[in-house]
């Protein structure tokens, strides 16, 4: 997991990073389950109205582009925590392949070329024309990133402190501030991943384990399975009108509950047991109709 994630951060950043975050759900060989929350956190200076204008309207893209769109990174702290608990190889060994990839380069695939080009204008708009991913890479090009290799070497040598302290932390904070962000050195020093109890539920004869809040995924999956379980969905063809109608209507109800009830359990009470209860889920589908979409006003 660690070596793969760091390697992806070099050659396929859509799927790997060192400045983002994530969730881990695991099952050990002796049947124990657990999960780790290492998602990004809001900076200490964040406020609930920071993406709103003076009259309370959402400012377009302010939460998506620029310095204020950036949360306090959790990836390296999360990977380091996983290594402390489960690692068998040394941290240095696990970071080494990504350093080699950054130094020696990787070959741009057709899909990567398309991905880079689709985001190139946005990278340049936010970071300037000299930004690394602002270059016009072609399929077959070899991409070498020696500056990133040096960052990874700091992480290899010093562990998570190589990212959250010292030179890298200073550069990260300064760059984010230049882009209008509010992440501080204190934010980086205070960051800590959290071991959480995962969500567990059944679908027919299957036992399913997934991520608990602040992820919405586990609860939404549990609700979705609970709402469709009374129906014999297996009798319908894949992507048939019947299967799509059932799944979409269940998803609409789950996402309505997601907006209403879910959030970070460190700050709010999430009524997980209530909204995963089988009686509640049956009642949620009481106005389901095979022949038409339920009005949104009747789903809230």
Features from the language model and the residues they span:
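Noncatalytic scaffold domains of N-terminal-nucleophile
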Residues: 2-165, 170-216, 276, 283-292
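Protein kinase glycine-rich loop
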Residues: 223
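Flexible, polar/acidic helix-loop-strand segments at domain edges
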Residues: 219
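Internal maturation/activation junctions in enzymes
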Residues: 230-300
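Short helix-capping/linker segments at secondary-structure and domain boundaries
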Residues: 84-89, 157-160, 228-235, 258-262
């Amino acid at each position: 997991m660690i070596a793969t994630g760091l390697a992806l951060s070099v050659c396929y950043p859509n799927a790997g990073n060192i400045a983002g975050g994530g969730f881990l759900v695991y099952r050990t060989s002796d049947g124990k389950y657990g999960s780790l929350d290492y998602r990004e956190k809001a900076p200490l200076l964040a406020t609930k109205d920071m993406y709103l204008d003076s009259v309370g309207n959402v400012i377009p893209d302010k939460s998506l582009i620029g310095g204020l769109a950036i949360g306090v990174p959790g990836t390296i702290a999360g990977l380091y925590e996983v290594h402390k608990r489960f690692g068998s190889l040394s941290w240095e060994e696990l970071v080494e392949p990504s350093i080699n990839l950054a130094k020696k380069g990787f070959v741009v695939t057709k899909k990567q070329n398309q991905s880079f080009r689709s985001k190139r204008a946005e990278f340049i708009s936010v970071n300037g024309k000299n930004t690394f991913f602002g270059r016009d890479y072609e399929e077959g090009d070899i991409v070498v990133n020696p500056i990133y290799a040096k960052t990874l070497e700091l992480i290899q040598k010093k562990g998570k402190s190589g990212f959250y302290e010292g030179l890298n932390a200073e550069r990260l904070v300064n760059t984010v501030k230049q882009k209008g962000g509010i992440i501080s050195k204190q934010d980086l020093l205070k960051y800590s991943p959290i071991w959480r109890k995962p969500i567990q539920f059944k679908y027919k004869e299957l036992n399913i384990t997934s991520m608990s809040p602040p992820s919405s995924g586990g609860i939404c999956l549990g609700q979705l399975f609970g709402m469709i379980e009374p129906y014999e969905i297996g009798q319908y063809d894949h992507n048939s009108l019947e299967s799509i109608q059932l799944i979409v209507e269940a998803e609409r109800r789950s996402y309505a509950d997601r907006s209403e009830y879910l959030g970070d359990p460190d700050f709010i009470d999430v009524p997980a047991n209530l909204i995963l209860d089988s009686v509640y889920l049956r009642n949620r589908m009481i106005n389901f109709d095979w022949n038409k979409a339920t009005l949104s006003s009747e789903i809230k």
